[in-house]
Amino acid sequence: MEKDSSIKKSRAIRRLVIWYKRNSAVTSIVDTAANSAVTASNVAGNVVSGAGSVVSTASNVAGNVAGNVVSSAESVVNTASNVVSSASSIAKNTLQPLVFDPLKRLQNSDNLISKEEVPNSERIWIAVDGMGGDYAPVPILEGCLGAISRFPINIKFVGKIEKVRYEAERVGLIDLLEKEIDNNRLELIDSGDPIGMNEEATAVRKRKDASINVAMDLVKTNKAKAVYSAGNSGALMASAIFRIGRLKGIERPAIGALFPTRDQTRPVLVLDVGANTDCKPSYLHQFALLGNVYAKDVLQIEKPRIGLLNIGEEECKGNDLSIKTFELLSNEKSFNFGGNCEGRDVLSGDFDVVVCDGFTGNILLKFLESVGGVLLDILRSELPRGRRGKVGSAFLKSNLLRIKKRLDHAEHGGALLLGVNGICVIGHGSSKSLSVVSALRLAHSAVNHNVMENLNQLQKLQVLNS
């Protein structure tokens, strides 16, 4: 009986593994799970003794490996989930993570995540609008504290100090906050109220003590190398223009966002995604120049391919703005213009930079933000019903979540405001701590790669002086 039970378990395991191999893209993870499961099954055969204990022992062992055909459907699902979880933890050390990280390749050279303590003299100060965002200041502060421990940065946290301390104590962050203040890695800078999400951007001119203005002044006076805000993006743009000014020759700054592509190590920079809803051909030409510098410096692409978002590949396609912009980009010799980019090609990896007006870009951005959740829901609804579907769901759960993460805006953190005299990172209004950490990594990388130095070189180009 002992031998028969062991044979049945082994057969069940093999059937599950064969089914998974036919339906999963990550076959190396499955191989690891299968080896673990078969080994555990053999151990189970030696441990199980006595007819009366066969079923219970088999249930305990199989619950940690790959399946128990003796138990109910719920036990089968739990078993499959445990196998995938075990395999995933093993795979983390042997396979490249599937989560999209636009600056993943830069982490080694930047030393962003280092086990060695970086002295304060070598850390970069970043000003943070602690009051900007739907849920500020708690998730902003939590993200800043997390980023300080992971990256060689210090934070000037701008906000109403009394409120920041009260909220930190309420959520249990006060001890960590005081520790970082004592270590001179975080400084609280007092300010007035933030510019509300529903307020006009021009409010920054009247309220000089607004948190975004105070943060921007820190960059202006060189007390910080970059600024981050998850508040009113229009107010951030207005404050940047009024406080630190535009780059010489740039008519309008643009918001550049990194989108995932088929190659998770090579994202595409799309700009503008919301700063300028109405654009001239000269604006888009300048966006291409800005994006080209960013792709070279931060993304480390030697010869970025620039695309113009349009409804067709042909030169004659599109509206008046597209046709005139195409002509300007085609005549530009300082970058590699790859022609029109249709909507279906944005995430293909064929282009490194895609330019468009802010109205179109913002729609594209918001659409992409919804894709991850919708895709996951569709895949779940298409799985078979019953026992087989539940087992399949358990096997695919971790993979589906990784797909969702690759398309989740929280994983990307923020977008750069390009075209002003400083590094400004704009966060999503609903940013949580994970988004803040990602955005601060983006700010650090931009500073570390001397983006501003090279952007300032653009004014030497004839096109910006004409």
From Swiss-Prot:
It holds the Pfam family FA_synthesis. Homodimer. Probably interacts with PlsY. It comes from Prochlorococcus marinus subsp. pastoris (strain CCMP1986 / NIES-2087 / MED4). Residues 1-122 are annotated as: Unknown. Residues 123-466 are annotated as: Phosphate acyltransferase. Catalyzes the reversible formation of acyl-phosphate (acyl-PO(4)) from acyl-[acyl-carrier-protein] (acyl-ACP). This enzyme utilizes acyl-ACP as fatty acyl donor, but not acyl-CoA. Keywords: Cytoplasm, Lipid biosynthesis, Lipid metabolism, Phospholipid biosynthesis, Phospholipid metabolism, Transferase. Pathway: Lipid metabolism; phospholipid metabolism. Its EC number is 2.3.1.274. Belongs to the PlsX family. InterPro entries: FA_synthesis, Phospholipid_synth_PlsX-like. This is Phosphate acyltransferase. It catalyses: a fatty acyl-[ACP] + phosphate = an acyl phosphate + holo-[ACP]. GO terms for cellular component: cytoplasm. It is found in: Cytoplasm. One of its GO terms (biological process) is phospholipid biosynthetic process. Disulfide bonds: none annotated. GO terms for molecular function: phosphate:acyl-[acyl carrier protein] acyltransferase activity. PANTHER family: FATTY ACID/PHOSPHOLIPID SYNTHESIS PROTEIN PLSX, PHOSPHATE ACYLTRANSFERASE. It comes from the Bacteria. It is an enzyme of class 2 (transferase).
